[in-house]
Amino acid sequence: MSKNYLFTSESVSEGHPDKLADQISDAILDEILKQDKNARVACETLVKTGMALVAGEITTSAWIDIEELVRKVIVETGYDNANKGIDGRTCSVINAIGKQSSDIAQGVDRGSLEDLGAGDQGLMFGFATNETPTLMPSAIYYSHLLMRKQAEHRKSGKLGWLRPDAKAQVTLAYENDKPKFIDTIVLSTQHNESISQKDLHDAVIEEIVKEVIPAELITKDTKYHINPTGVFLIGGPQGDCGLTGRKIIVDTYGGAAHHGGGAFSGKDPSKVDRSGAYMGRYIAKNVVAAGLADKCEVQVAYAIGVAKPVSLMVNTFGTGKISDSKIEKLVSETFDLRVGKIIENLDLLRPIYRKTSNYGHFGRELPEFTWEKIDKADNLKSAAKI
């Protein structure tokens, strides 16, 4: 790749139909974990006009009122009137949950957490870069900020004409592999009938874009596409069917890193799609925070029923202060990559997952997000002798 280029990432709001589905799946997981930390949960959700379908495999001693919980999440997300796309108070809720296969359980459940086998085969990636304060790629970082500000102004009533469904996209111009300025911002937001397109355009730029995008990244040539198709009244599940796990690039690094293909929401941490990806981020972030590289990508892979990974790979894209093979060795010595130890060390059996389902699983330094800690950075730096 040339050192001078444009790079684009997108984010979506919590009211986007796919994100509504993710929230429902993770809310169900959280409620189960409150009662049963040993539960096995794989919960998928589909939302469409007037209905929500919950399906998957759950094995647990917990009891939760799934219908009530689904309705609660839909209303809390802002869908409390059918003219917004769905009304959580009146929509149909269909429950098609079954139990986890006993064939899978016999390979995964081994008694002690330390011996826990991976819930499936798969490959996961973690990534970090020193482009932003949270060590996330710039385009996804700013896309998430735009969507969080849209939600903030909608909920506070500051921009009372906003509705829940929205998307943002940011294109960064890179020079010598470093982000220099924003070339293009795209933001589409659902709204009610009371706002004109001109007033909406001006308000989005003044009250959303300028509140979160640093002025030094905006130039006279920065292009804005605000609701570029015009009116956006029909949104949410009425406009598009929503499905769990369909925004995996929004959930991770905005396309700036590889993705193993597995979604996160609705899965308990015995599923390495989730826990392995969280561990990958934890490793990559600590490597960059330690100053061992400007950019780091980690791949781990697992076999179903096997506790240890079948492979580990570290790539610093030529930015490493020591060789990638040396960093890989330090990672192996510093981090325990057995599935059960990942769950234990990152404390993943807590009901924290609905918070992850919006605005990215990575790059938000919340107390619950243990994979965002940089508590291993000093150890890595000391061991690397740099």
From Swiss-Prot:
Principal cellular location given in the protein's record: cytoplasm
Pathway: Amino-acid biosynthesis; S-adenosyl-L-methionine biosynthesis; S-adenosyl-L-methionine from L-methionine: step 1/1
EC identifiers of the protein: 2.5.1.6
Residues at which ATP binds: 16, 165-167, 240, 246-247, 263, 267
Region (Flexible loop): 100-110
Residues that coordinate or bind L-methionine: 57, 100, 240, 271
GO cellular component terms attached to this protein's record: cytoplasm
Cofactor, free-text remark: Binds 2 divalent ions per subunit.
Cited Pfam families: S-AdoMet_synt_C, S-AdoMet_synt_M, S-AdoMet_synt_N
GO biological process: one-carbon metabolic process; S-adenosylmethionine biosynthetic process
Residues noted as binding K(+) in the record, renumbered to the chain: 44
Reactions performed catalytically: L-methionine + ATP + H2O = S-adenosyl-L-methionine + phosphate + diphosphate
Transmembrane segments: none
Subcellular location(s) of the protein: Cytoplasm
SUPFAM superfamilies on file: S-adenosylmethionine synthetase
Entry's Gene Ontology molecular function annotations: ATP binding; magnesium ion binding; methionine adenosyltransferase activity
Positions that bind Mg(2+): 18
Statement: the UniProt record of this protein carries the keyword Transcription regulation: no
Top-level taxon of the source organism: Bacteria
UniProt keyword list: ATP-binding, Cytoplasm, Magnesium, Metal-binding, Nucleotide-binding, One-carbon metabolism, Potassium, Transferase
Required co-factors: Mg(2+); K(+)
Function: Catalyzes the formation of S-adenosylmethionine (AdoMet) from methionine and ATP. The overall synthetic reaction is composed of two sequential steps, AdoMet formation and the subsequent tripolyphosphate hydrolysis which occurs prior to release of AdoMet from the enzyme.
Family, as annotated: Belongs to the AdoMet synthase family.
NCBIfam families listed in its UniProt record: metK
Subunit record text: Homotetramer; dimer of dimers.
Protein name, per record: S-adenosylmethionine synthase
